[in-house]
Amino acid sequence: MERKELSYTIQSWSSYSGAFHPINILIDNPHQANSRWSCNTSICKPNNSEEQYVILKLDKLALVTDITFGKFHTPHLCNLKDFIVYGGREQHLMFPLLRAGLTNDSNRETFPLCIKKYNKIENSIACKYIKIVPLQAHAHEFNMSIWYVALHGIDSASALSCTEKNRALHLEKKALNCLLSYFAFKGKLDICSVILQSYQLSIPHSPLMRMYDAFCRLGDTQKTILLFQQELQAEIIEKWPKHKLTKLRSHRIATFLKGISRRSGHQMVYNPKDNCIYLYGGWDGVKTFSDFWIYNVDKDLWIMENEYGIPGERVCHRMVIDTSQQKLYLLGNYFGSSRETEVPPDARTDFWEFDISKKVWTCLSYDTSKDGGPAAIFDHGMSVDEKRGIVYVSGGCKWDPDELVFEGLYAYDTKNRIWEQLAVRYEDRQKHCEFKIERMGHCMEYFPDENKLYIFGGQSYDQEFILDMCYIKLETREAVQHVRKNDTSQSPSPSFCQRSIMDSKNHRIFTMFGFEQRNIHKVLRPSLWIFYITTEEWVKISDINEEEGNEHPCSRFGHAVAADLNRNIIYLMGGNASTHPLRPMKLSDFWKLDILDRWGIKHCLSNVSLQLHLHRFHELVSENLAKAVEYLQKSMQPQFDKSPLFWNALILDAFSGTHKNKDIAQRRFETFQTIYDLLPVDENTVAPNESLLNMIEFFT
């Protein structure tokens, strides 16, 4: 099945301004300022709720796989920072296929159009109409503009026939599930059996169905609790999505009253062989440090290895560890403002190696630019392939008195002591996705299982923060750009000086953001995310202490992180808690962040159990108040870790008598619905509910 460019016409639009008619997006003319569609200025004000859109009608029904946006030949503030794309067979029935934003540059950008409607895997759907809804330009006071749109996909009869068949099967299955769920809710299990036999489906005697039968139909709460403990718990653990498991819990280890002072721009790595953390350099706002510290985790003790020796003062450098060879590699330095009229005489990139066993620093190069490596750089990316003995360096700002200049991608062979600059090409299908390795303040992580480099985030030439990500297949030097999923709220904001950790065992990257760009503003706002390599999705995680209002790390950037992934611990130290260049707020706090991979399951099981016991408590309140209080004290308080306020509120509620007149059957069903909402069910789960009635009411 051949993918090709799909022809279309302009079907309708919300508005347009002056000569900027929607028909202009049919022609790619990046050097013509008028060759674009712009919505009417008076209509597209932020406080106006009227939706702006343009609808494209394809010449033929087709599986639309992706959409390409052309741009003006220079960055333009009218480019779309946020937009949604819908698609479908009919104008009145279209589904969201993409939510994304364009980078404010001159490069074309291509995005996949897909939907998770017919199965768990994202697929393209057959469309006759495509609707583009602009939401925001790169500047609020400017019109929202689209310069050019190209659609690509497959319109062969065989492909459409196969898609239609899958669509019909999926809709039929959903219809059956709705019927089964409704009749189970009404207690008509004989009708459920007839439907299942007619379609040759197995009868769903799942723990959830048995629990519903015991709880809602028979009213046996004690039996329901036993069913939950003996059967449903195991099913929850098996079905729970891995990406919904993880939380962090922070613990402050120490504040440095002596020794290590406040700083940012320092580097920190963890060595599993000796269970120690190695920290080098940094800046306190006035002084640049050359101190080298070792933290012994077992002894909870910091030891200064050297204070004024080699490799010397530095900040915004990078340091990585090769645990197999027990070597540290250190590169880069920030010498002052990149706008100085002259390059400082010591602005060279010296490259150092530290032998952990011998505790000796060795200079591998006094000027890497003369040895085939990068020029004097800072805020670059650095990672190591321990198996092959290669250190990779990407981006970073070079010293230039006139403009920001960024480096490319380099590899250093630690065995042969040789630098090599790597040329990267892009996959044919992504030839218009020109990911720029040349950036600063970004992250780069090496993924050993697939011999790939992941590069994301940082700052571009125009000093805008970026989030785009690509991975580089090192065997072929081929780059593939990762495209954010349909909802931009499901990915981090563009950021600078974020910190990342590769967890290769679990195929994920932990990233700690702090200095983010929200719309046109750059703000300090903490956020923790995991990028799952297998599913190519970002998932936001949280610090439990922050959720509970307890002590936790504040917003920061330029901090240092290191991870002991064998014990599921991330260490965090220092950073800058202010974005004001003249009023920096350097930090000296030291934190341990425990990675709780099973927190989601435990939280779910605890909440389900609590709901059942609360229902039993309210049943006893209606029958015998003394027994209810005894049940709370002996069966609930020892099992659930709740505050005195929680238990006091239950007692007061019991004595108020508000539950005595409530219909017991209705209360059981409400409790079951609360439990159902907590469970990791999917669209194939048959669970008793009355959603069928709601659907009929909605469509009639």
UniProtKB/Swiss-Prot annotation:
UniProt keyword terms in alphabetical order: Kelch repeat, Repeat
The Kelch repeat ranges on this chain: 276-322, 327-381, 390-439, 452-499, 508-558, 569-619
GO cellular component terms attached to this protein's record: cytoplasm
SUPFAM superfamilies: Galactose-binding domain-like (SSF49785), Kelch motif (SSF117281)
InterPro entries linked: CTLH_complex_component (IPR052456), Galactose-bd-like_sf (IPR008979), Kelch-typ_b-propeller (IPR015915), Muskelin_N (IPR010565)
Extra information: Transcription is induced by mei4 transcription factor.
PANTHER family with a match to the protein in the record: MUSKELIN
Protein name from the UniProt record: Mei4-dependent protein 6
Organism: Schizosaccharomyces pombe (strain 972 / ATCC 24843)
Gene: mde6
